[in-house]
Amino acid sequence: IRDRSSHVSLEELVILAEAIITAISKSSGRYPRLVLSSLREFIDNAPYFLGKTACRTALQLVKANVLSPKESKARLVLLRHGLPDAEVNCHVDRAMFDSGKPMSLDIAWKHFKVAVEYDGDHHRTDKHQWRRDRKKRDRLRQLGWTIIVITADDIRDEVACAEFALNVARELTLRGCDVDFHVIAMTVEELARREKAADRKKRRESAV
């Protein structure tokens, strides 16, 4: 991330950081949140390097446990259009496969039972994966979940991204969520500044 920070966009830096966290977590067995914490500490304590400010800005938006770059992209699209933050790859209560393994969702607002699932090509071409996805989604819809399934086409350009975000915003609103939808997406830089301001406000309030 250090080496790339001065050569890629802020969005790409967030996606790269989330991919690194997932890779380290899988290879080492460490919890993703601990890896993220270590990454933040490493960047904060590192001597100055070209791109350090960009790294620290990107880390305002990075989440642990995002399992694919396209999921990272989809999550950022939703945030840039004003949707509330969501949990990533979270387990759903009382929902398990026959093996006993808990069912999880890529991006989810658990309180409102709305979720987004990203399907790469392997979800379509791998019969086992396709059947597994179908079984999971049928089960979760029976439990009252609204599940929006997207592919790479849904986040390919600004128009597609806006339509995707509007669709999710509509479903959240129908479930009682207050959504401040932005037709024109914020830049990733604007989003990072907003997150930083919100974090500062939260810290001030908790200190009182």
Segments (PLM) and residue ranges:
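Surface segments flanking catalytic/ligand-binding clefts of nucleic-acid enzymes
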Residues: 25-208
